């Protein structure tokens, strides 16, 4: 199931709960642009209502979703985070770019350090554009 756009008071999260006969739910969250406070409340409620016997996986988890996980302990429900989008910024050419990272032991073990990437436009090293410790520690805590 692909979730895109803004998660807010106009969002219909009912497809997350239309799981008759399913034992797995895979969410592609790369298209989530932002989430407001009403969206956070509704998202947490939707995650809570997914039966515990359904395996839930988040793929390509967008930056706004990862940021919410850093602040709200139960934001993910009983989901497993398989991959995240990581924000980077190039000081040389002013490019913002997100790289896909698979969640594995290297990413979720202290010290939390963002891998280095070169800018796809100018080839210079890019800077991770969030607080590494918070960003990666929140993901690490999911399956701990």
Name these PLM-found stretches.
Residues 67-144:
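Cys/His-clustered metal-coordination modules, chiefly Zn-binding fingers
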Residues 1-82:
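Amphipathic alpha-helical interaction surfaces in cytosolic regulatory modules
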């Amino acid at each position: 199931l692909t979730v895109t756009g803004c998660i807010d008071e106009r969002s219909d999260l009912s497809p997350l709960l239309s799981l008759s006969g399913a034992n797995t739910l895979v969410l592609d969250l790369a298209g989530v642009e932002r989430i407001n406070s009403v969206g956070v409340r509704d998202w947490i409620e939707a995650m809570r209502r997914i039966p515990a016997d359904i395996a839930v996986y988040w793929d390509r988890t967008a930056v706004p979703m990862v940021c919410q996980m850093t602040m709200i302990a139960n934001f993910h429900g009983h989901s497993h985070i398989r991959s995240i989008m990581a924000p980077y910024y190039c000081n040389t050419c002013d490019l913002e770019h997100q790289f896909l990272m698979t969640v594995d032991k290297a990413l979720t073990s202290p010290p939390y350090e963002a891998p280095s990437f070169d800018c796809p436009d100018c080839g210079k090293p890019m800077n991770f554009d969030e607080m590494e410790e918070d960003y990666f520690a929140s993901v690490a805590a999911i399956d701990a």
